[in-house]
Amino acid sequence: MNRRAVIGRLSLMLGGTIIGAEFFLSGCKSDPEKINNLFNADDLALFNEIGETILPKTATPGAKEANVGQFMALMVNDCYSPEEQKIFTNGLTKLNDRCKEQYGQDFRTINAAQRTALLTILDQEQKKEAKNNQHAVHYFRMMKELTLLGYFTSELGCTKAMRYLPVPGKYIGCIPYRKGEKSWAT
């Protein structure tokens, strides 16, 4: 065997190894869109839009800036029971279906006034269900609670929406409060 034949066969084997490995490893890639077991990046964006509709940006940052979508996904995935997770995920589907029914678009593409109107209706429905003492929690109540909890426990919520005094600070047992002032975060 001469040197040219050996080099030709080696390059063929090496090329086949590289191409074969790339083909084999292409099946090992995970879906980059997946956030956790239940939600993907589109769901996260939807959570942020729901949160921003509930707590919009004003003189203080809104829920989207506090990234409540990430908080909601984490809490539902890690802290909710399978039954509660099912209520929540089915609720997302119901929300988008209802939105498409009323406006012909999904929640993320309708305007702010339409979002507010839809969430106001859902809020009224969940209040009626709570008054009727129905056992299952309404999915919108879960979304609203998670939005508020995520926002007011975030750094932006604590430092920008409420008064914040970093610890350690001196203890003042009685602080005068005037109506309309921010409440204390700590």
What does each model-found stretch correspond to?
Residues 7-26, 111:
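N-terminal export signals
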Residues 54, 58-67, 181:
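Long, well-ordered alpha/beta core segments of mature domains
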Residues 39-45, 62-63, 133-139:
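Structural motif
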Residues 49, 67-186:
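Mature-region segments of soluble proteins
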